[in-house]
């Protein structure tokens, strides 16, 4: 195991391909100690609120996340200690009662729409990536994902996109692009960018 694990931040708009880029990196190092942690796992617990109140949550605002807890757990992993990561239930709009045990790794990919927005998170990262994808492509992907995986209606998705997702993208997410070491146009289909990133990771891991 490396003396100090490396942390890679991957961000971009909702439906922009962040997870696909992260998984492409994971798949490129099948024999390495590497894991992905999603900022979405750290949405705040809302079990004390009524369901009607929960569904009004602005999930694209920094205050929706318990980023303090994420930072605490990342520091634990950097220190070589395992953590129990929360699991979020999107259908109930609150945290599940179960957690996921994550052991320390050599490479930790931190993925989420706002992971470059918080300076404290940025300070933990060795490589910062911004996946830059066309707005139309992102909304189409979001519709497919939320309908298939999260049981939402088309009307609710479009309403949320126009009233919350798009404004929050321009207020918080897009401005964080300036902190990225590498901007990846079109996400995982940009093979050259993925190869450059993988080469950098491989050099750190001593696999080249």
UniProtKB/Swiss-Prot annotation:
* The keyword Metal-binding belongs to this UniProt entry's keyword annotation: no
Kind of enzyme, top EC level?
Answer: transferase
The pathway it acts in is: Pyrimidine metabolism; CTP biosynthesis via salvage pathway; CTP from cytidine: step 1/3; Pyrimidine metabolism; UMP biosynthesis via salvage pathway; UMP from uridine: step 1/1
One Pfam annotation, family name? Answer: PRK
Q: Extract the Gene3D superfamilies matched here.
A: P-loop containing nucleotide triphosphate hydrolases (3.40.50.300)
Q: Its principal location?
A: cytoplasm
Q: Which GO terms describe its biological process?
A: CTP salvage; UMP salvage
- Keyword ATP-binding assigned to the entry: answer is yes
What's an example GO cellular component term for this entry?
Answer: cytoplasm
Q: What catalytic reaction does the record list?
A: uridine + ATP = UMP + ADP + H(+); cytidine + ATP = CMP + ADP + H(+)
For this protein, the record's InterPro entries field holds:
P-loop_NTPase, PRK/URK, Uridine_kinase, Uridine_kinase-like
Query: A Gene Ontology molecular-function term?
Result: uridine kinase activity
Supply the EC number(s): 2.7.1.48
Could you tell me the superkingdom of the organism this chain comes from?
Bacteria
| Keyword terms | ATP-binding, Cytoplasm, Kinase, Nucleotide-binding, Transferase
* CDD domains in UniProt: UMPK (cd02023)
Note the PANTHER family from the entry: URIDINE KINASE
Which NCBIfam families does this entry report, sorted A to Z?
Answer: PRK05480.1, udk
**Family under the similarity heading:** Belongs to the uridine kinase family.
Q: What is this protein called?
A: Uridine kinase
**Organism (species):** Streptococcus pyogenes serotype M1
Gene name of the record: udk
């Amino acid at each position: 195991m490396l003396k100090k694990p490396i942390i890679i931040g991957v961000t971009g708009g909702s439906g922009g391909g962040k997870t696909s880029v992260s998984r492409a990196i994971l798949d490129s190092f099948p024999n390495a100690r590497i894991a992905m942690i999603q900022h979405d796992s750290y949405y705040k617990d809302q079990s004390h609120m009524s369901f009607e109140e929960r569904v009004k949550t602005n999930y694209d605002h920094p205050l929706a996340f318990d980023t303090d807890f994420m930072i605490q757990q990342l520091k634990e992993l950097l220190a070589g200690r395992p953590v129990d990561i929360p699991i979020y239930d999107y259908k109930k709009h609150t945290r599940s009662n179960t957690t996921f045990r994550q052991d320390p790794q050599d490479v930790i990919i931190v993925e989420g729409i706002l992971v470059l927005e918080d300076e404290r998170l940025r300070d933990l990262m060795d490589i910062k990536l911004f996946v830059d994808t066309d707005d139309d492509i992102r909304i189409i992907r979001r519709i497919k994902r939320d309908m298939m995986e999260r049981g939402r209606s088309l009307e609710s998705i479009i309403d949320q996109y126009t009233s919350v997702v798009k404004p929050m993208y321009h207020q918080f997410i897009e401005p964080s692009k300036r902190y990225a070491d590498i901007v990846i146009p079109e996400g995982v289909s940009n093979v050259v960018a993925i190869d450059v990133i993988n080469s950098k990771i491989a050099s750190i891991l001593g696999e080249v």
